[in-house]
Amino acid sequence: VNRELALESYLSSGVPGTVYGLYMAHQKFGNLPWKKLIEPSILIAEKGFKITETLAKSLETNSLKLAKRSSTKEIFFKDGSTLKTGDLLVQKDLAKTLRLIAQKGPAGFYKGVTARKIQSDMRKNGGLISTRDLSNYKAKFRQPIKFNYKDLKIVTMPPPSSGGLILGLMFNMLEEITLDKNEPLSADNILKISEIMQIAYSLRSVYLAAVSYTHLRAH
């Protein structure tokens, strides 16, 4: 597997679901008007906010990745280096996109000018997402995965996200081993947990796919 292609290239991107998911959650559970909810984010994106120490460290850590793309370099760099603590981060384009989402709901993102810009950027950089993919996207309510670990009841995300199933698998395997409670960060504990994680993630690539198109078998 080409790690860079799988994790950092345009081929690693799926259709973004956050906008549609948040809109559906608002329609079902929200009380405030949709536009009013987005207003503060538009203001912050347009006027900017001061970079915190934590964000500055994160930008510095990821500076090589951010420098690869002119779009991210333009936003997160100043005078040849990433923004520092106290610098102002302004995101005018984000403010424009948020305004469209505030006015039109999901259509402000998945259709029209935003969708066309996403498709154009994808085509320039070897990505696959098209305006058709975006306009056809729909979020879905799904039943969460529930499982027990010792005296805890854990509720987490179902497929098509792999996280919940993998988490459940790892906890099931943890039930079969003994960890040193007095030394949680001991080398032996870390080795056992890392081996469990490796096994779980290797199984993910074999058995998991989108549930709308694939039947998942229980093992």
Predicted region positions:
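Noncatalytic scaffold domains of N-terminal-nucleophile
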Residues: 1-104, 110-158
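Conserved small/polar residues in nucleotide/adenosyl-binding loops
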Residues: 214-219
